[in-house]
């Protein structure tokens, strides 16, 4: 039976259709938002996976190019690996729903969102996020939702729900918020130096819209929802728990307080091994239970130590930042480098400058575009002292790279002021938490070292939260252990003036406005401290680019002159490129960018183009090249691509019988421009520049 439900979202109808397609999935729905259609399905395995200590959830976002009437490019005419946008959207679907499954539920769960049709003003990512919540909520899968998601923009101080593509161009904020009726679960934001108060107001505005959507989904579930499967989770043996806690005594707490990460892990590992050996001997075959209890006790002890004693695993205060060091210019042949170290986290970021043709072409479900500023983040296994196969970038690496890219984007100069493509690569050399925010700092240092005139320095900090038995501890600059065992991961990047990027994931309910307000205020203090430390290495962008960076020169010509610079079949522009070794990029408005390996090549190419676009002037004298001999005269090229005729009568004062008697093809001669007729044809004279012969005196008759 087909059921249709409708509400208004962002001033447009949002329609949910159930019971028509994908009926064999445990949960499915078709989302129709304007002309955007997204099919979302949810399925779970019948039995849990044995031996897992995590929840095996996978979320996929499939971009079908037929949704925008395109055929995939290349030799293989079908969609292949997900685009960066698809990967980021899959992460947006995953993050708010993952905490809402029962603890101990280890069945495989897969959510697939397939984009079937795209209306650029009705975002398919938001449709997919809401659709995933609906598909899970109406299924028998034990999902403790529903959740909902909205996008928020800000124009002239006013917040807009799900802004259109035109509104996004004007917006100072790009915010996506997911949550339940009671709490915000996930935030992803990019902003143009907005204040903490503006960001917080936008989040609260989004949550009010989320509440309306959740109420709408609850109505759908009440009408068509299936009974939820029962989750049987084995309870911890209270007697065994008490024995393990007694055995650990204060040893575990002391091990957790070890400052050095590697030493701390070794100490915890040694105590755990000792406990496992002891209880295996005492209760044979119960090692798995003991191991589960040990993992829980590590979390309990760490959280209790932070909330009750105000002590963190490395003995820092709650708002204390780890020691920071910054360096620039450490790689001699690169265009710019920044090495940022914070505690045991270290990131090297390298800047590479290229000409505008190096910009990345974006050809997905959105309108065709190109990206001249890119950031890529790499997290090799050695950064955490581990081994693993190194293949392509993981979803996490793509997500972190996009976050750092968003943090720096408002500071990147426009193409007109800095006509370069910019690629940043952050290599995580060592990691004990906050590597993405260390990449923000390293990227700022690297850009400044490269001489990119950024509008301001950007720093990033990761904040954490522990909420235990009514006690709340907000942590600045969290390390890996605090991230894993905490209740919130809040990453904030910005300048001294405001926030440029924000990402938040919350694992528990009950994070209210006051907590977020306190966390953002504490993050600002930490961010300012980090910026001051970064200034010890470099305070402003270098005034000169690296000697190894391309030299880009900009020239503006009348649009009508563009065809003259290009020439028939590209003849003129290819000649310039061949003779000078430069790269040339021409835009429709007449802006020409010349990228050269050195300043001399740039100068020569610039002069050649200036000559091409220069208009011939009547009365001017030119040195031209004879390009063709005719019976009636010679054609002479006076400027690149511009030629005129020297009529045989204008070659010399005396009578010339044959043009070839005076000139040959390839000769360089001086000519004067005598006229340009209404058809644009140029008349030249060689004779006008030659001295007139003296008249012979008449013979005297005796």
UniProtKB/Swiss-Prot annotation:
InterPro entries: ExoRNase_PH_dom1 (IPR001247), ExoRNase_PH_dom2 (IPR015847), ExoRNase_PH_dom2_sf (IPR036345), KH_dom (IPR004087), KH_dom_type_1 (IPR004088), KH_dom_type_1_sf (IPR036612), NA-bd_OB-fold (IPR012340), PNPase (IPR012162)
Record's subcellular location: Cytoplasm
GO CC entries: cytosol
Reported cofactor(s): Mg(2+)
Residue numbers binding Mg(2+): 483, 489
Residue span, S1 motif domain: 619-687
Signal peptide location: none
Classification via Pfam families: KH_1, PNPase, RNase_PH, RNase_PH_C, S1
A single MF term (Gene Ontology): RNA binding
SMART domains: KH, S1
EC identifiers of the protein: 2.7.7.8
Keyword line: Cytoplasm, Magnesium, Metal-binding, Nucleotidyltransferase, RNA-binding, Transferase
One GO process term, biological-process aspect: RNA processing
Coiled coil region boundaries: none
Class of enzymatic activity (EC top level): transferase
Domain KH: 550-609
Reaction equation(s) it catalyzes: RNA(n+1) + phosphate = RNA(n) + a ribonucleoside 5'-diphosphate
Function recorded in the entry: Involved in mRNA degradation. Catalyzes the phosphorolysis of single-stranded polyribonucleotides processively in the 3'- to 5'-direction.
Recorded family membership: Belongs to the polyribonucleotide nucleotidyltransferase family.
Descriptive protein name: Polyribonucleotide nucleotidyltransferase 1
Lineage, broadest ranks: Bacteria, Bacillati, Bacillota, Clostridia, Peptostreptococcales
Gene name of this polypeptide: pnp1
């Amino acid at each position: 039976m087909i059921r249709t439900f409708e509400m208004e979202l962002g001033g447009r109808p949002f329609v949910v259709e159930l019971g028509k397609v994908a009926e064999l999935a445990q949960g499915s729905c078709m989302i129709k938002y304007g002309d955007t259609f997204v099919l979302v399905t949810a399925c779970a395995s019948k039995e849990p996976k044995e031996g897992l200590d995590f929840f095996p959830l996978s979320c996929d976002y499939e971009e079908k190019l037929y949704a925008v009437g395109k055929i995939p490019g290349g030799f293989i005419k079908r969609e292949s690996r997900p685009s960066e946008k698809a990967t980021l959207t899959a992460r947006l679907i995953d993050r708010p729903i993952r905490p809402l499954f029962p603890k101990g539920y280890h069945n495989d769960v897969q959510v697939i969102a397939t984009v079937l049709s795209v209306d650029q003003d009705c975002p398919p990512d938001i449709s997919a996020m809401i659709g995933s919540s609906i598909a899970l909520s109406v299924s028998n899968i034990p999902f403790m939702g529903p959740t909902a998601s909205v996008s928020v923009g800000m124009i002239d101080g006013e917040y807009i729900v799900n802004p259109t593509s035109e509104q996004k161009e004007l917006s100072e904020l790009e915010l996506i918020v997911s949550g339940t009726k009671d709490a915000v679960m996930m935030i992803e934001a990019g902003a143009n130096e907005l204040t903490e108060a503006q960001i917080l107001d936008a989040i609260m505005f989004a949550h009010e819209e989320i509440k309306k959507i959740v109420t709408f989904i609850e109505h759908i579930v009440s009408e068509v929802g299936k009974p939820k499967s029962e989750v049987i989770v084995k309870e911890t043996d209270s007697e065994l728990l008490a024995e393990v806690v007694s055995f650990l005594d204060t040893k575990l707490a002391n091990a957790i307080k070890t400052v050095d990460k590697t030493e701390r892990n070794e100490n915890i590992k040694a105590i755990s091994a000792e406990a496992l050996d002891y209880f295996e001997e005492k209760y044979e075959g119960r090692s798995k239970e003991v191991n589960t209890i040990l993992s829980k006790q590590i979390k309990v002890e760490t959280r209790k130590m932070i909330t009750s004693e105000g002590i963190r695993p490395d003995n820092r205060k709650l708002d204390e930042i780890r020691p920071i060091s910054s360096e620039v210019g450490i790689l001699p042949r690169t265009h710019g480098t920044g090495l940022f170290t914070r505690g045991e986290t270290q990131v090297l970021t390298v800047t590479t400058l290229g000409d505008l043709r190096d910009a990345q072409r974006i050809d997905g479900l959105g309108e065709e575009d190109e990206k001249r500023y890119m950031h890529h983040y790499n997290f090799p296994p050695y950064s955490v002292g581990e081994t693993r196969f190194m293949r392509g970038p993981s979803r996490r690496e793509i997500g972190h790279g996009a976050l750092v890219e968003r943090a720096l984007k408002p500071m990147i100069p426009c193409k007109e002021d800095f006509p370069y493509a910019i690629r940043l690569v952050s290599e995580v050399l060592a990691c004990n938490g906050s590597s993405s925010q260390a990449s923000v700092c390293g990227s700022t240092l690297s850009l400044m070292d490269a001489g990119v005139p950024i509008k301001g320095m950007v720093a990033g900090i990761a904040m954490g939260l522990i909420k235990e038995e009514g006690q709340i501890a907000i942590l600045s600059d969290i390390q890996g252990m605090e991230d894993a065992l905490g209740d919130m991961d809040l990453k904030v990047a910005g300048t001294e003036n405001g926030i440029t990027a924000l990402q938040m994931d919350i694992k528990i309910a009950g994070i209210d406005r006051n907590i977020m307000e306190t966390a953002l205020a504490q993050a600002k203090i930490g961010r300012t401290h980090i910026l001051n430390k970064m200034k010890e290495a470099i305070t402003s962008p270098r005034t000169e680019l690296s000697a190894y960076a391309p030299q880009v020169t900009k020239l503006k010509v009348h649009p009508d002159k563009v065809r003259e610079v290009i020439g028939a079949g590209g003849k003129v522009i290819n000649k310039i490129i061949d003779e000078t070794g430069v790269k040339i990029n021409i835009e429709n408005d007449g802006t020409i960018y010349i990228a050269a390996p050195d300043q001399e090549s740039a100068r020569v190419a610039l002069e050649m183009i200036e000559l091409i676009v220069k208009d011939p002037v009547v009365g001017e004298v030119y040195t031209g090249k004879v390009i063709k001999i005719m019976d009636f005269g010679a054609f002479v090229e006076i400027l690149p691509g511009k030629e005129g005729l020297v009529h045989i009568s204008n070659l010399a004062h005396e009578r010339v019988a044959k043009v070839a008697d005076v000139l040959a093809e390839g000769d360089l001669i001086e000519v004067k421009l005598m006229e340009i007729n209404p058809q644009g044809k140029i008349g030249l004279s060689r004779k006008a520049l030659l001295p007139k012969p003296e008249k012979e005196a008449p013979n005297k008759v005796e």
